Amino acid sequence: LVTDAMKACLLEDGEYELGGQRVVVKNEVARLPAGNLAGSVLTLDKALRNFTANTGIGLIDAIKTVTENPARVLKVNDRKGSIDIGKDADFVLFDDSFNIHATFVKGKKVYERVVKWE
């Protein structure tokens, strides 16, 4: 799995200037004012969620499509794609619904989801 999501993937519904063009983001779709698609807003966590829901593939094999497999194809599997001694320790913590809770790069936490308790 891959994503070519543009900057709009992280934006709320509204109008934005992206790449020198006006882009309208609505319901997780980015379009130009004339209605043409402006680009992808599919994030990798959503792609993984869709992939498992629509194929019935098991979690371990699904995770490999966004970790080990691309690292091997890009010839960076000596340091990326899995957690092992001597590797970079880049990983994401997520729940059963693929909601991201934390992201680590080279073993350092760079993102943590803030949970608001009601």
Q: Can you name each region flagged by the protein language model?
A:
Residues 1-3, 8-87, 91-93:
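His/Asp/Glu-enriched, well-ordered alpha-helical/loop segment
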